[in-house]
Amino acid sequence: TEDYTEMLLNISFTNEDDVIRMLVDGIDEKDFNITTVDEDGKAAGQVEIIGWLYQYYNTEPKNKAFAKKAKITKEEIPAVTQLFTPDWIVRYMVENSLGRMWVEGHPDDELKSKWKYYLDEAEQEESVQQELDKIKAEYATLKPEDIKLIDPCMGSGHILVYAFDVFMQIYENAGWSQRDAAQSIIQNNIYGLDIDDRAAQLSYFAVLMKARQYDRRILTRGIEPNVYAVQEGNGISRGQLKYFGAGLTDT
C-alpha cells in the first residue's frame, strides 16, 4: 500500500520479521480473547495486548534515541521511557492498594480469595494497630463511588484496566449491577495521565473496551474515561501546592 498505512504496518506475506507474522506466530491466540479463563476459572484474556504492541511500535525510535548517545530531548521521552508492566506486578499493586482499602473497611474473605497476590496485614505493635484501626474505621464509611484511583504514568492503561476489574468486584460486593457499575467506574473511580499522546489514546480505548465487557452499550452512553495526555505544565498555584501537602498556609 502506497500510503500512510505502510509506515504503520509494512505487511509482507514472506518476510518472517514482518510485524503481522510476528503477531500471529509469537502471541498465543488466547491472549487476544478477553473471554479466556485460566485454570482457576478467572478471566485471563488480554485487553492489555495493545500495551505490548505499542511497546513494540516504539522500539525503533527508542533504539535511535539511545544510539546517538546524547541528551534525550523532551520529544523523545515517551519512546525511551515506555516499559510494559508485567501482569503479576499490576495485580499485586492493585490488590494490595485498592483491594486492601476496600476489604479493610468492608471485611469479606470471599472477595479476598479472588485476589491471588493479596497479602494479609502483618502483625503490628499495639500502638500501631490502634492507629490502623482508626484508618479502617474511616474506610468502613466509604462507598464504591467515593474511591479515586489515579495512575500518573498510565502508558497504555494496563493498571487502569485491572483496577477496573477490581472496582467491578467491589461494586458487585456492594450490590450494584454490572451495567451501572461500569458507568460509575469510568465517571467516578479511574483516572490516568501520561506524557505520550498515543499512550493516552490507547488507555482511553482500553478502558472503554474493558467497560464494554460489562455493559455492551457503554459506547452509546456518551461517557468518556478520565485519561489525559499532559506533556508539561506552565505553572502551579499555591492552592495546588497546599492540596499536595507542600506545608503551605493561606498567608
Please place each PLM-identified region on the residue numbering:
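Compositionally biased, intrinsically disordered low-complexity regions enriched in proline and serine
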Residues: T1, T5, T14, Q55-N58, ...
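Non-catalytic nucleic-acid substrate-recognition regions in nucleic-acid-modifying enzymes
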Residues: T1-G51
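Non-catalytic substrate-recognition/targeting regions of SAM-dependent transferases
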Residues: I20, G26, K64-A67, V103
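General structural signal for alpha-helix termini and helix-helix connectors
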Residues: E29, N33, V37, T59, ...
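Core structural elements
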Residues: G45-N63
